[in-house]
Structures are given as C-alpha cells and as structure tokens.
C-alpha cells in the first residue's frame, strides 16, 4: 500500500474537486494509459488493486507506471462516538483524482494485451475511465 513517509501535517481538510486536472493529463512514460473521466478520491488499496491486476495480466512483458500517489490523509472517528471532541485519527490515504488525470501507463506490450490489462484495472476503479493511446 502506498503512503507518504513523512508529512508536514497529520490531518487535512477535505477540500473540493473543482474542474479538470491541469497536470498529469498527458501520457509521458508509456504508450497506453488509463484516464479518469470523473472526480473521486482513490484509496491506496484501490490503486494497489489496479496495479496488481495489470501486473498479473501482462505477466513478464511490459512496464507499468502508476501516475497517482495517495498523499491525502482521511480521518475517521470511532463508532458510537458523540459529535465534537475534535477531529478523528487518520485511517487511510487517498489520491485526489480530477477528470482528465492519467492513473496508469503501460509500455512494451502489444495493444490488445495492454487494452485487456488496463480494462481489468479499470473495473477495480470506483469511477468511469477511458483507455487512451499516445500519438
């Protein structure tokens, strides 16, 4: 599971996901990619599940790049706790994904293999995505 080694602050505001992704929306490493079409928080578990699915599908061939990193802590209060008495403790990490963001890239394999592997990874994601090919 991905998580930052060290952060400046333990807890963060939730924030908003307005507009499209300004950075990380072009293919820069591989030839094929999975692009987000909706805004969402992707947990480190979801990112890892997608990566494992792709790796398992291409077996020994090709290279995979994970283009997102979960750097936002999500806090959760214990169950049966009354309101107030501060913010909960950090439970898991999420990556804030806006529409247009590249999630995974792949290279060194045939298009049909890449398409199959990326579609399996896409099924693990909680958002609509699309398969794209670099020009």
UniProtKB/Swiss-Prot annotation:
Compartments in which it is found: Plastid, Chloroplast
Molecular function as annotated in GO: rRNA binding; structural constituent of ribosome
GO cellular component: chloroplast; mitochondrial large ribosomal subunit
Predominant cellular place of this UniProt entry's protein: plastid
GO biological process: mitochondrial translation
Positions of region (Disordered): 1-24
Record keywords: Chloroplast, Plastid, Ribonucleoprotein, Ribosomal protein
Compositionally biased spans, kind Basic residues: 1-23
Family to which this protein belongs: Belongs to the universal ribosomal protein uL16 family.
Protein name: Large ribosomal subunit protein uL16c
Species in which this protein is naturally found: Pelargonium hortorum
